[in-house]
Every structure is written in structure tokens, then in C-alpha cells.
């Protein structure tokens, strides 16, 4: 939130001066939706709508095969990619095909599905509630794990006729995986391997801007941010991405705005794609979800949402305090990639997480990587993606 406010203030102070600054060639994907971004590079694209048990309608995107293997008959192994906090399906296809995990997996022979969590740009529909109502936004990552993930996985498996899939999560995408697979053995059985990028469970040691949010008293937090959407993806973000961040003089401001959230990594950031990143991010979430992360910073625990009073927790959980999520109960094989310069998924929190995983098959800590490098770094294929493809290939043998 803070980087956006700084950027807006900068525009206000500068007036229309930025119009006279040097222009970088714009990437057309900055003005596209998910299907258009996929098709732009010559890949097949499908959009499906998943209805969760509690009525949310999520757009899920499919790349059924790569550009050059359309005629290969037979089922392809299924991979489901789940974005992180404030992200969307675009996170997996925002770079050139050779640098985007969604495209790389399709070209490697996989049936690729891109998920969206309730409340982001591509998941703002409900059977009964309008996004204008507070009821629509009454959710956190608890509900994403309880409803979104199972509904989406079951939909994908029904559609493809397969019994299991590979699950790749980034950031909050790993969080909901940890919850869902540890609390639902039936769902866990449908996962071949869990590939966790920048994994987040506890955030006791985080150095991200969540620390600043945690300092705001609860009552003041609700006054400032309301009770609906946090960090909406609006015309302003697209304007910043398409117009402002494609100016040579201002692209450094945009880059540092992103790094302020996640940690600095100058050598890996592809400045030529900055307008695409900013145009599609942040994709939004609920204020309640942000409150849940704020609670996690303050408590240092990996637990369900605290409703604020013992009697309220009793109503939801049949106990006066929020239940702790038991990471040791997850038996899904898991491969982990973490970063030593990650302000959100701090190495100390990652170490705690690793100590609780009963079926860890691989771990790699990448020097100088930050939280967003796992989806946008120019060397992500060498550091992460090729290893994911190799591990998945083992399942084919």
C-alpha cells in the first residue's frame, strides 16, 4: 500500500511532467487479460469458472499444451499453479515464454492450470453477494484453503480425468497448501508433489511492510482500510503500469516500489517487463485477509483467524482461541525453494517450517533472491524452474 501512495504522491507533485520523459517501448500484455496474455505468445488458452462450496466464482485458466506439441496424443500430467498474496494467474506468465513457469511447463509436456484466489481481479463473483457488500469480503486465507483450493483441484481433476496433480504454490499459495493438505487427508491424496516457492507459514521474523501494518491498532486499521477490499486493482494501477512505469526516468521509482515490499535484487529484475508487473499487480484481497496476516505477525503463530473475543472464537472453532495449524500432519511430498533476501518469508521462519515437514524431498536456499524473484527473476529458470521440471519428470518414470 505504501509504495502505491508514494507513487501517487509523486505523480501529483510532478503534474503532467512525466508525459515529456523518455518513453520505453510498451509491452502489449500490460493491457491484456489472462487469456489474451496466453494467446499472445501462441499458446492455447481456456478459461473456466469454478464455483466453491460457499458460492465464490473463481476464474481458472488452462494452457493444455505447448506451442509445438499440440498433436501429441494422450493425457498430459497436470500441474496447478497457485499465486501468492495480492497476486493472480498473471504472475506465472508475465515474462517472456522462456522465463515464465506457466509457458515452460506447457512446452515441457504438461497440462497447466493457473488458479485465482477469491477477491483478486479475476475472482470477484459470487452466487449471492455483490463485491460491493461487506459479506463478499468476509474471508481470509482460511477460506482459500478450506474452499478455493479443494474446489479448484477437484474441478481440474474432473475435467482432465486424472486422479492426481502436481501443485506449485508461491507465497500465500504455499500457505493455503499447508493448511489444506494438513487438514484434509482426502485432498492431500490428490497431490503428487507440492512445490513450494518462497514458502510462508509463520511470519514471526518477517521484515516486510506487514510489520508496519501490525503496529496499527485494530480499530484504527478498520477505520483506515474499511471492511471490504484491500489493495484493489483499479484503473490507477493499469495507468501506472502502462504509462508511468514505461518512462525511462520513472522506471527506477516503480522498481524500488516493488522491492520495498519484498527485498532488493537489482541484477535479476527485468526492467523491460516492469509495465506488465505493475499493470497486473497488486490484484487485491480482502481487508480481513490482511488482518489475518497482521495477526500472524503479532502472534508469531501459524493459526486460524482470530475473531477478536473468546465467545466469537467459540462460535467458529468450538474453542476460545484460534486453532493452530499442525504442519506435521501434512504427508504430501514437498520440495522447497527459499531465499536469503526475502523480507516476507524470512529464513528463520523458513527454518521453523522445514523442521515441521515430515516428507521433505528437496530444499534449496538461493543467495540474494527475494520474494518476487521466484516468479519474475531473469535467472528463475536456471535457479528454480528447470529443477521443478526435473523433479516432475521423475514421476513419469
Curated annotation (Swiss-Prot):
Protein's cellular compartments: Secreted
Enzyme Commission no: 3.1.1.3
GO annotation, cellular component aspect: extracellular region; intracellular membrane-bounded organelle
Top-level enzyme category: hydrolase
Residue span(s) of domain AB hydrolase-1: 77-376
Glycoprotein keyword on record: yes
Leader peptide range in chain numbering: 1-19
Protein name: Gastric triacylglycerol lipase
Species: Bos taurus
Amino acid at each position: 500500500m505504501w509504495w502505491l501512495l508514494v507513487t501517487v504522491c509523486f505523480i501529483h507533485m510532478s503534474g503532467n511532467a512525466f508525459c515529456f520523459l523518455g518513453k520505453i517501448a510498451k509491452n502489449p500484455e500490460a493491457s491484456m487479460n489472462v487469456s489474451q496474455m496466453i494467446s499472445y505468445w501462441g499458446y492455447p488458452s481456456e478459461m473456466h469458472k469454478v464455483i466453491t462450496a460457499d458460492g465464490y466464482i473463481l476464474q481458472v485458466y488452462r494452457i493444455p499444451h505447448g506451442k509445438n506439441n499440440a498433436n501429441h496424443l494422450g493425457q498430459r500430467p497436470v500441474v496447478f499453479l497457485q499465486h501468492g498474496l495480492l497476486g493472480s494467474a498473471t504472475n506465472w506468465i508475465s515474462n517472456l515464454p522462456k522465463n515464465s513457469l506457466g509457458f515452460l511447463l506447457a512446452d515441457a509436456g504438461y497440462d497447466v492450470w493457473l488458479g485465482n484466489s477469491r477477491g483478486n481481479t479475476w475472482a470477484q463473483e459470487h452466487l449471492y453477494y455483490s463485491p460491493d457488500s461487506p459479506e463478499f469480503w468476509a474471508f481470509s486465507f482460511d477460506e482459500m484453503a478450506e474452499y478455493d483450493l479443494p474446489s479448484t483441484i477437484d474441478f481440474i481433476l474432473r475435467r482432465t480425468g486424472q486422479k492426481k496433480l502436481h501443485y506449485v504454490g508461491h507465497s500465500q499459495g504455499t500457505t493455503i497448501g499447508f493448511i489444506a493438505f494438513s487438514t484434509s487427508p482426502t485432498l492431500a491424496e490428490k497431490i503428487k508433489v507440492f512445490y513450494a516457492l518462497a514458502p510462508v507459514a509463520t511470519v514471526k521474523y518477517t521484515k516486510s511492510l506487514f510489520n508496519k501494518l501490525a503496529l496499527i491498532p485494530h480499530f484504527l486499521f478498520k477505520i483506515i482500510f474499511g471492511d471490504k477490499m484491500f489493495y484493489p486493482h483499479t484503473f490507477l494501477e493499469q495507468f501506472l503500469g502502462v504509462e508511468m512505469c514505461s518512462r525511462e526516468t520513472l522506471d527506477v521509482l516503480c522498481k524500488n516500489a516493488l522491492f520495498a515490499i519484498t527485498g532488493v535484487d537489482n541484477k535479476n529484475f527485468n526492467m523491460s517487463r516492469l509495465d506488465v508487473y505493475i499493470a497486473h499487480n497488486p490484484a487485491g484481497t480482502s481487508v480481513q485477509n490482511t488482518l489475518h496476516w497482521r495477526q500472524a505477525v503479532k502472534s508469531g503463530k501459524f493459526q486460524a483467524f482470530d475473531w477478536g473475543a473468546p465467545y466469537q472464537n467459540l462460535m467458529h472453532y468450538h474453542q476460545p482461541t484460534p486453532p493452530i495449524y499442525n504442519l506435521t500432519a501434512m504427508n504430501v511430498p514437498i520440495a522447497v525453494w527459499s531465499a536469503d533476501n526475502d523480507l516476507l518469508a524470512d529464513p528463520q521462519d523458513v527454518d521453523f517450517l522445514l523442521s515441521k515437514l515430515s516428507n521433505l524431498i528437496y530444499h534449496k536456499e538461493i543467495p540474494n533472491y527475494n520474494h518476487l524473484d521466484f516468479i519474475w527473476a531473469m535467472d528463475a529458470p536456471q535457479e528454480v524452474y528447470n529443477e521443478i521440471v526435473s523433479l516432475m519428470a521423475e514421476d513419469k518414470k
